């Protein structure tokens, strides 16, 4: 690949280096991202090139944030319910624990600073984001607000 055609996507480069995607898949995703506005990672998941978990783990690596498997996490219900269910679903976030005035919150998109600020305002606590998959966040929200075995809204 010529030097001047190197992609400018660190996420894409990380996925390519991990052999999760090929160079042609990366280039196609970059083109679609630019032409459609669709996030590159979402394009790769939607088209079956990578799994949702591969995307979340790579995003966590890229941003230097922890990845959390919400199916295995011990979610503190009182903190999880500090935000409205509708907000949690719409923004794909869920507070999962609290320590020393900090609210650890599972997020699908840790780059959305507005959501992180909203959470701080709603809870009065500093927010520490951890990354989880969108589907795991939705499943956890349903467990928190409806109990185990409940059907999603």
Predicted regions: what they are:
Residues 1-3, 27-32:
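Short, recurring structural edge motifs at helix starts
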Residues 5-14, 36-43:
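Short, solvent-exposed linear patches
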Residues 17, 41-125, 143, 147:
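Polyanionic, low-complexity intrinsically disordered segments
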Residues 29-36, 71:
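Short acidic/polar beta-strand-loop edge motifs in secreted extracellular
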Residues 126-133:
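Short hydrophobic alpha-helical runs that function as membrane-insertion/retention elements
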Residues 138-153:
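Short, low-order "capping/linker" segments at domain edges
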């Amino acid at each position: 690949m010529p030097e001047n055609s190197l992609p400018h996507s660190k996420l894409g480069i990380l996925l390519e280096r991990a052999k999760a995607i090929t160079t042609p898949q990366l280039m196609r995703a970059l083109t679609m991202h630019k032409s459609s506005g669709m996030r590159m990672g979402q394009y790769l998941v939607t088209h079956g090139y990578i799994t949702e978990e591969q995307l979340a783990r790579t995003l966590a690596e890229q941003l230097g944030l922890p990845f959390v498997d919400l199916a295995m996490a011990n979610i503190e219900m009182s903190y999880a319910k500090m935000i409205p269910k509708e907000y949690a679903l719409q923004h794909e976030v869920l507070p999962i624990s609290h320590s020393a005035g900090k609210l650890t919150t599972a997020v699908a998109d840790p780059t959305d600073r507005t959501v992180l600020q909203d959470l701080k305002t709603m809870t009065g606590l500093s927010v520490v984001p951890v990354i989880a998959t969108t589907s795991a966040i939705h499943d956890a929200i349903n467990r928190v607000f409806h109990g185990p075995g409940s059907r999603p809204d």
